Amino acid sequence: MKILHASAEYFPYTKMGGLADMLASLTKEQSRTEEVYVALPLIGKLGKEPNWTGKEVGALLPQDAKEETIAVSLLAKARFREAIESGVKLYFFDSELFSGLNSIYGQADEHYRFAIFSYACYALSQILQVDVFHAHDWHTALSLTLQKNSTKPIPSLFTIHNLAYQGDHPFWMTGFLKEDPFYLITSPFDQDGKCNYMKAGILSAGQITTVSPGYREETLREPNGFGLSYVLKKRKADYTGILNGIDPDEWNPKVDKRIFQTYHLQNWKEGKRKNKEHLYREIGRPNVSLDLPLIGLIGRLTYQKGFPTFLQAFLERRHLPHRYVVLGSGDPETENAFFHLSDMMPDVFYFYKGYNESLAHQIEAASDFFLMPSLFEPCGLNQMYSHVYGTIPIVSRVGGLRDTVDESIDIQFKTGIVFEPNDKSSLGYALERANDLFVSPERDHVVKNMMNLDWTWTKRKLEYDRVYKIAIELLE
């Protein structure tokens, strides 16, 4: 089977969140048995220099583009450049729209940029003559509408990674697209008087998935549908929740080259202690006791991730002996609060603004617990990384966290600490339970349960194969 994925993110080239990790690990697994391609923008600052093959693909104009328009002009000057990564063929969209960017998101005209990128992805799918076209999130959703309206549509799948981001904008911002004979702004795009790419993707795709069964259920009702639950209900029969997986070559304490000391189930205590000692030296906190529980937090400092609730709970439970290492960036107020705590309580709290892949691995390996107080979480990957690294996750009971972390009364099944509702009292009580667990013999059983879990893509790839088959049968 020939599969083309279209995405704004792909690790390690354009990573802003879990989408990049998910797609890189999924396609790596798929490439073992299928012919896999990925289309992504070529921005000015990539996380890694691609392994270019020298092959290029041009002529990106859809066959029915007969008039000279802005979109046609931009596509005529663009091309895809091929590279290889872990057996996957990557097609970087080389266009003046993206070449000057240091970050894939955040531009005022990003709706315009991703509209043109979606045109190009649609054209590439026709050129490569793939069997399945798989688009990810709103950035590539317009390509699904083009597929649906094509005289030769390709079976398609749309994966929703985060319904909170919908690519909605005033119609005038991409009004120029009305001029193109192969693009029509019609009712699928209209949501509350705005052009909504996510809605168009949901209504246009042959099949729809999201990244956990729990998040699928949540998005079928408001407020978790962010205004689109009624659209998803229309496609409920075609909507599937499939948990993400992780790459065992990338996230595995047995072979991780980014951590100070590799370890496994039989020596996890020794391994984590050495990694904790190394991390404290690296962040300038060499005098912190290794016998105190360390809690790691990694993520974008956004409303979704629940950091304000954490701050409230932390201040109310500051008598607990926990130490914290936080890696992330985002909301300025949250950043300032974390910097303040880091300055005022240096032996208790450390904050690194930004994202650092090596530090992320070191935090997972060194921490005793990993906190995810998300208000909603489509899937989450860090709780899976934490399981593999013997780092007990403390999570809110939402979305994919609910599907993957179990605070069972039966010690044989316990794989973390879960709290609800998501407020300072519930989170504070969860922190107290973590403190008790840290010194309890029960901790050994929990870590064993976690490190024996299988979060690889082997089973999940088969679930995607099943959905691909349904999409193909719809067009036969």
Curated annotation (Swiss-Prot):
Its EC number is 2.4.1.21. It holds the Pfam family Glycos_transf_1. GO terms for biological process: glycogen biosynthetic process. Keywords: Glycogen biosynthesis, Glycosyltransferase, Transferase. GO terms for molecular function: alpha-1,4-glucan glucosyltransferase (ADP-glucose donor) activity; alpha-1,4-glucan glucosyltransferase (UDP-glucose donor) activity. It catalyses: [(1->4)-alpha-D-glucosyl](n) + ADP-alpha-D-glucose = [(1->4)-alpha-D-glucosyl](n+1) + ADP + H(+). ADP-alpha-D-glucose binds at residue 15. Pathway: Glycan biosynthesis; glycogen biosynthesis. InterPro entries: Glyco_trans_1, GS/SS, Starch_synth_cat_dom. Synthesizes alpha-1,4-glucan chains using ADP-glucose. Belongs to the glycosyltransferase 1 family. Bacterial/plant glycogen synthase subfamily. This is Glycogen synthase. It comes from Leptospira biflexa serovar Patoc (strain Patoc 1 / ATCC 23582 / Paris). The gene is glgA.
